Swiss-Prot record:
Keyword Transferase on entry: yes
One GO MF term attached to the UniProt entry: 3-oxoacyl-[acyl-carrier-protein] synthase activity
Active site per database record: C169 (for beta-ketoacyl synthase activity), H309 (for beta-ketoacyl synthase activity), H346 (for beta-ketoacyl synthase activity)
Family indicated by similarity: Belongs to the thiolase-like superfamily. Beta-ketoacyl-ACP synthases family.
UniProt protein name: Putative polyketide beta-ketoacyl synthase 1
Keyword Cytoplasm assigned: no
Length: 422
């Protein structure tokens, strides 16, 4: 018998919204969190704007010693995980630790700390024969992507399968998808799943500057991210984390947990085409959607909302529009599709998990978040992108899709309580 997978807890650290209530308030209002960069001096960069988190780790209960050693992205994940676990009401002291898993994603790991320590060991980049004596003993733990899952597992005593997923901008979706499979296939009863990234750092911003992927609209940052709009000119870098507590459905019911929704299907494919390029037909994303729907035994005409990758680059938004039309057929024109990146930016590996939490909340509130700043239609992007204002709507089946550098294409299907009764 197939094991069903429930979402019983959610937590989020996002630009403009630390914690679930503040996050949903931002999304439902259509406000944007993009401002000028304050985390470092961006002088000389083409894109000098970002969606930063107003984040004080000590104010959110993290231990000062941990804050000293842990990179910002680890801090985000721990705060989001604390919120999700508290929300779920689960008591890990009564759980079998071998049946508790962790699946977390990150695209760039602790680059902020790595850049900082490179300055220390190289005399601000002036030495190639680095002074190893200046390296901090916690550096490896601070920047290694494996630390993300390890630190969260240690915090909650999880001794089941523990993994960090790094598949570029689909890392968060894939971490949730792998968690779903881990429970569905019987390898765990509970999984702490999600993703975290803090990529607003000089080298990371410079990398995306170099390929002109980020918006140069420095004079009007609040309107810089405009997915699907004819005048879009790149994405806005963001940061943050989202964590979900996933449980085998009967396990959740047995302890009387509140069930937000179920994860019904997941799929991921590669395009074997180009590191950053996308095929114009959207075949690989369409394939991911098709397989996720088939996994969930949901018909394309049952989809009530698509949470788009919607990065705001010229090629992505065309590619994604084509993929959704290929998978949903004529129903695509009747299905609202929006991008929350217009409000919280693109936090690379973290955004997929943040978007899954947005989908959980959309199902819970029966409201579709808008695409902020969408004003001028693009003839090649001709679907309903929910411009500027959130929209009440019956939602039973919600699809979240993602696209990552390296050719990764992923999709997760979420089903609300009423969806199983259709």
């Amino acid at each position: 018998m197939t094991r069903r997978v429930a979402v019983t807890g959610i937590g989020v650290v996002a630009p403009g919204g630390i914690g679930v209530p503040a996050f949903w308030d931002l999304l439902s209002s259509g406000r944007t969190a993009t401002r000028g960069i304050t985390l470092f001096d961006p002088e000389g960069l083409r894109s000098r704007i970002a969606a930063e988190c107003d984040f004080d780790p000590l104010a959110h209960g993290l231990d000062p010693e941990l804050v000293e050693r842990a990179d910002r992205y680890i801090q985000f994940a721990l705060v989001a995980a604390d919120e999700a676990v508290t929300d779920s009401g689960i008591d890990f002291g009564t759980e079998n630790p071998w049946r508790v898993a962790v699946s977390l994603g990150s695209a760039v790991g602790g680059t902020t700390r790595l850049e900082h320590d490179y300055v220390l060991v190289s005399e601000r980049g002036q030495r190639w024969d680095v002074d190893h004596r200046a390296a901090e003993p916690e550096l490896h733990r601070a920047f290694s992507p494996s630390t993300l899952a390890a630190d969260v597992a240690e915090r909650f005593g999880a001794q089941g399968p523990v993994q960090t997923v790094s598949t570029g901008c689909t890392s968060g979706l894939d971490a949730v998808g792998y968690a779903f499979h881990t429970i569905e296939e019987g390898r765990a009863d509970v999984c702490i799943a999600g993703a975290s990234d803090s990529p607003i750092s000089p080298i990371t911003m410079a990398c995306f500057d170099a390929i002109k992927a980020t918006s140069p609209n420095n004079d009007d940052p609040e309107h810089a991210s405009r997915p699907f709009d004819a005048h879009r000119d790149g994405f806005v870098m963001g940061e943050g984390a989202a964590v979900l507590v996933l449980e085998e459905l009967e396990h959740a019911r047995a302890r009387g947990a509140h069930v937000y929704c179920e994860i019904g299907g997941y799929a991921t494919f590669g395009n074997a085409y180009h590191m950053t390029g996308l095929t114009s037909e959207g075949l690989e994303m369409a394939r991911a959607i098709d397989v996720a729907l088939d996994h969930a035994r949901v018909d394309p005409t049952d989809i009530d909302y698509v949470n788009a990758h919607g990065s705001g680059t010229r090629q992505n938004d065309r590619h994604e529009t084509a993929a959704v039309k290929k998978s949903l057929g004529a129903h695509a024109y009747d299905t609202p599709m929006s991008s929350i990146k217009s409000m919280v930016g693109h936090s690379l590996g973290a955004i997929g998990a943040i978007e899954v939490v947005a989908c959980v909340l959309a199902l819970a509130r029966q409201v579709v978040p808008p695409t902020a700043n969408y004003e001028t239609p693009d003839p090649e992007c001709d679907l309903d992108y929910v411009p500027r204002t959130a929209r009440p709507r019956r939602l039973d089946h919600v699809l979240s899709v993602g696209s990552g550098f390296g050719g990764f294409q992923s999709a997760v299907l979420l089903t609300g309580p009423a969806g199983r009764k259709r």
